[in-house]
Amino acid sequence: MVSFCELCGAEADLHCAADSAFLCRSCDAKFHASNFLFARHFRRVICPNCKSLTQNFVSGPLLPWPPRTTCCSESSSSSCCSSLDCVSSSELSSTTRDVNRARGRENRVNAKAVAVTVADGIFVNWCGKLGLNRDLTNAVVSYASLALAVETRPRATKRVFLAAAFWFGVKNTTTWQNLKKVEDVTGVSAGMIRAVESKLARAMTQQLRRWRVDSEEGWAENDNV
């Protein structure tokens, strides 16, 4: 199974257990070069042929590429590839089951709407773990869902995007802003949350500008009628 980069959506080349993230070579180099501690993370190389996680590890901000790997499909006597690891959680398992069920009834339910509903359920669950009251939960979920809506990537329901959108909602609706607790609740590293949340925030700003321009143009057309 092909895994995709959590930051850009391209095919992933490595998996970082410390960040619970799949990354392509380019994003891995940028992200792990941004901080001395990040650079020390060990990342597992993904076999370019069978797409499984190998037993080859790399560390440091810059990598020689391609790394030396022996694909299990090339050698029947010895396999460098482990069984495919999946970064999962009870929330993501629930998301996958719900989306799969939606595919079986596409004539009645829009799969995108199902994904949004599942994401909202995950946000509510995380708010509960943070101890937020109903009003704050509604506000956080609204902002987080809006952040996901402006994200056009087809893999926007991945845990890293959910965590980033959730942090966006928490930042913009509460005075309680503890990224460490959000990290603990979501299972996504603070560094990954910050990196993706900043992209969501920029996308949100651009979308708000477009909405404002469209609204102003609409009022102008009405005035001319």
Swiss-Prot record:
GO terms for molecular function: DNA-binding transcription factor activity; zinc ion binding. A zinc finger (B box-type) spans 5-46. SMART domains: BBOX. Its main location: nucleus. One of its GO terms (biological process) is regulation of DNA-templated transcription. Signal peptide: none annotated. InterPro entries: CONSTANS-like_Bbox1, Znf_B-box. Repressor of light-mediated regulation of seedling development. Functions by suppressing the activities of positive cofactors like BBX21 and HY5 involved in modulating light-regulated gene expression and growth. Interacts with BBX21. PANTHER family: B-BOX ZINC FINGER PROTEIN 32, ZINC FINGER PROTEIN CONSTANS-LIKE 10. This is B-box zinc finger protein 32. It comes from Arabidopsis thaliana. The gene is BBX32.
